[in-house]
Amino acid sequence: MSSLTIRDQKTDDLLTPENSTVIIIDYQATQVGSIESTDKYRMVQNTIALVKLAKVFKMPIVVSTVNVKTGINGPTIPQIAHEVKDLPSYDRTTINAWEDKEFLEAVKATKRKKLIIAALWTEACLLFPALDALKDGYEVYPVVDAVGGTSVVAHEAALRRMENAGAQPTGIMSLICEIQRDWGRGETVPGMLGVLAGIGNGVGLSVGYRQEP
């Protein structure tokens, strides 16, 4: 039972802690409250899991909001804000985060070409930066079970448009497994199991039971 030598984490075709950036856009009360394409609670839990995953594996996280400083919108919801409280949050007036100077500079500063993106709504604040990032040579991985739209058809149409442009949809369970990759990498297993336990689906509940004394 021997694992192969770990591939170069910076050049690996799969997502790794050293070649990927996690981007969280517009998880604010107005946006979360207007989601109609999926279960809001599960969506938020999956987004929290995404942030926790990035923290366990020390991946860069870029956080952005829209229209907080103008007074039109509120800040990132507390459940997620608690997890990113030590990180800068780039507030914008642009619906497309890729057209905001500070946000774009923050993404470029990570020097990572694989972008794992969760944003609300799917049909706007996820779709637009995803298309622009693809055009600029980035690989884009929308986290489909951590995002939502104002309707099922709008959400699904936006995902199709991104995929047709070259985006590679993924989900939170797939990401957790892809980033961990090998149970033999024991230093991150406890943190990874903690992320799994917090999701609340069948796998998360099973892990939670196993972790109980």
Which role fits each region the language model picked out?
Residues 35, 65-67, 94:
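Short, well-ordered turn and helix-capping elements at secondary-structure junctions
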Residues 18-20, 35-63:
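A short alpha/beta connector and helix-capping loop motif
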Residues 27, 63-65, 144:
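A cross-domain feature marking catalytic cores of carbohydrate-active enzymes
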Residues 2-21, 57, 69-213:
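Active-site-adjacent betaalpha module
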Residues 28-34:
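Short acidic, Gly/Ser-rich segments with clustered Asp/Glu that frequently serve as metal-coordination loops
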